[in-house]
Amino acid sequence: MRKRCYIVLVVIVGWLVGCLAGCGKATSRADADTTPAGRELIADAQFERGMALSPLWPHIVQQGGGFSRTCTDTLRFVQSDLNPIWQLCQWSSRYDLAGAEPKRETDGRDKADEAGKTGKAGKAGEAGKAGETGKTSEVVFENEAKRVALAEDGTLTLGLTTSREYDHPRKADEPWTHLLVQQDFDSPPHIAEIEALHFAMELKVDYCHNRLGEAFDEEIHTAQAPFYLMVRNGNKESKDYGLGLWVGIPTFDYRYKRLADTETIHWDVGTATYIYTIPPRKIWGDVDLGNGNWHKAAQDILPLVQRAVEAMREKGCFMDSAPEDLAITGMNFGWEIPGTFDASLRMRGLSLRAEEIQN
């Protein structure tokens, strides 16, 4: 399946280089008991600076001079004059979120109950304080097909109703709708310079309804929400300069109730880039991510990223790339729905900490 914000056969320009304040924050001693060591790569994890909104089609960005020149709006969940770090991509859609007015809603979750709910894969998150009562609220941007909401506890909701996007069962050669968030990393860490890469994330799929009926074809139709890191050779003196690799951490995929325990590698025509997919069971455990529970991933994924590079070398790629040439430059996460599905998920606690080697 096509990854990140790209549609098949379309090469989109690079990400906005805008990771400013909030990135590069090292762990303090006070945080040492609960927070993994290292420098946080995810900037503005609470989305306090909002999101720059993409146009509806990648070629607009490609031909218009980049994301910063072609973004159609900024979604502000709280008042801020700072430029957004996050980008929200709404590719191949009929409905533009630009101009949507924010509204505050009660999301129905009880603060006391929500604190501590998670799946089998990890410990409870901290959605509410102990003893806190009442319902949580969220700021919502929505239109006929999309719903993006940020709760007061930092939980992000991404909802996509593709029954309003597609007027027929999607065919194999047709683009599909995306709704995802992405950012570049400030001071991207090089693989050779870190001894650990601590990944954490909590995920809950609220619903995913297949509207295709008998027209459903699992070869071309699904609703999925992958997480991707970009690994790229940034050494201008290297023959592999500019060569990139998508390293995928699969999450929910409608087609598979049980997570796979094998890696996959394939060539993506649209971005002329290999995609290496980490065995998702190594990240989430042997769980059903679509069961309506919170699930948590928390582990050092550096060995898995190193394995991704090794797998590429086994295929004859990155042969002129030393570990010090390869940097982890950015991420994206969200819905890719190449079929008629109505789906919504929530995400919280996203963190990626690079623990540098101490000389």
Predicted regions, residues:
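Short helix-loop boundary/capping segments
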Residues: E195-L197, E202-L304
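C-terminal motif of bacterial Sec signal peptides marking the signal peptidase cleavage site
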Residues: L20-G22
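Long, intrinsically disordered low-complexity tandem-repeat segments
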Residues: K111-T133
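Long, compositionally biased interface segments
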Residues: P280-N359
